[in-house]
A protein has these predicted regions:
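Glycine-rich phosphate/diphosphate-binding loop of Rossmann-like nucleotide-binding domains
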Residues: 6-25, 29, 154-247
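Short coil/turn connectors at secondary-structure junctions
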Residues: 5-8, 37, 65-69, 123-127, ...
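Solvent-exposed alpha-helices and their adjacent loops that cap or buttress functional pockets
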Residues: 2-4, 11, 62-65, 119-124, ...
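Active-site rim loops that border cofactor/substrate pockets in soluble metabolic enzymes
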Residues: 43-46, 217-265, 269, 274, ...
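Glycine-rich phosphate/nucleotide-binding loop
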Residues: 256-353
Length: 358
């Protein structure tokens, strides 16, 4: 049997631990026997990121901008224990965070619904899609530990040298400080992606922050969403028979648990990170969740929504049997292939008939 041909290489980002093992198995057993696979390969394993001072992550994002479509394996975001385990030069930032910052756009995560696996929340009869803002907040934060008494200030220096200062806290002892930021342009792109995706999929869109507490930071998100919706999408939503709904994040959680599903839940970066894991677990498993980063510039990056499955990897190293669920990683490859079908021969379109575009 002749292999399906590819006309343009696509970006492949390898990863860590057990998912790295699965990654190679999927290629060897499901892809390479049938496709003349052409990828521009980047090893985002923690050892290679450490060797290159994380430059390999930056280069993989640039390649995605060049070729338009990428598929990514799960990767380790190091903590103190990983620093010791891998003898790292420094505690490298999340590769996902770096890639998201460079590509912008929105991460859409949805459960893989199959017969025989019922949601733990009995009212849920339809999938719930999490739209996670892909830039800023805690993932691009700067942090500092303070050893003793002192004054912490938030300082903005304008181009003309003018300074604006806000007191953060008068420390009486040791503590920690964190500075976060976001960009109006990125929030606007997030809003457009969410509204367009809702129209494409004919689903209601929910958005939630904590603007009653964060009266400038979170309120900016709320205001930008509402302004864009009123000016550009309100009529289209009415014609499509769908709605845009804003509420506080705690109220949204309560409503979600009582809903039947079938909507898109737009969240800020951290909220989306947490809630997507909750949604996936309640629908069955973290290994049954798709994830795609959609950039307003036309870039797509597909991956599984779960991590590297560390415990299984340690068992694998000992020669013990594991039963790691590979479904979400397989779906990342199928969605990647489906999206890139124009770069392949026509036969590849039929190879993954169940794969769905974002």
């Amino acid at each position: 049997m002749s292999k399906i041909t590819m006309t343009t290489p696509l970006v492949e980002m390898d990863g860590d631990e057990m998912t790295r093992i699965l990654w190679q198995m999927i290629k060897d057993e499901l892809l390479i026997p049938f496709i003349d696979l052409k990828t521009e390969y980047y090893d985002l394993g923690l050892e290679e990121r450490n060797r290159t001072d994380d430059q390999v992550t930056v280069e993989s994002a640039k390649a995605t901008m060049k070729y338009g479509v990428a598929v990514k394996c799960a990767t380790i975001t190091p903590n103190a224990a990983r620093m010791t385990e891998y003898n790292l030069k420094e505690m490298w930032k999340s590769p996902n965070g770096t890639i998201r910052a460079m590509l912008d756009g929105t991460v859409f995560r949805a459960p893989i619904v199959v017969k025989g696996i019922e949601p733990n929340v009995k009212t849920w009869v339809k999938p719930i899609t999490i739209a996670r803002h892909a830039y800023g907040d805690v993932y691009k934060a700067t942090e500092m530990k303070v050893a003793g008494p002192g004054k912490a200030e938030l300082v903005f220096t304008a181009e003309d040298g003018t300074e604006t200062r806000e007191l953060i806290h008068e420390f009486k002892g040791a503590g920690v400080i964190q500075g976060q930021h976001n960009l109006d342009d990125s929030i606007e792109s997030f809003a457009h992606s969410c509204f367009k995706y809702a129209l494409d999929t004919k689903q209601d869109l929910w958005f939630a922050t904590k603007d009653t507490i964060s009266k400038k930071y979170d309120h900016t998100f709320k205001d930008i969403f509402q302004e864009i919706f009123d000016a550009q999408y309100k009529d289209a939503f009415e014609k499509a028979g769908i709605t845009y709904f804003y509420t506080l994040i705690d109220d949204a959680v309560a409503r979600v648990m009582k809903s039947e599903g079938g909507f898109i839940w737009a969240c800020k970066n951290y909220d989306g990170d947490v809630m997507s894991d909750m949604i996936s677990s309640a629908f069955g498993s973290l290994a049954m969740m798709t994830s795609v980063l959609v950039s307003p510039h036309g870039y797509y990056e597909y991956e599984a929504a779960h991590g590297t499955v560390q415990r299984h990897y340690y068992k694998h190293l000992k020669g013990e049997e594991t039963s790691t669920n590979s479904v979400a990683t397989i779906f990342a490859w199928t969605r990647f292939s489906r999206k890139s079908r124009l770069r392949c021969s026509r036969e590849s379109f039929a190879l993954f008939p169940s794969a769905r575009l974002p």
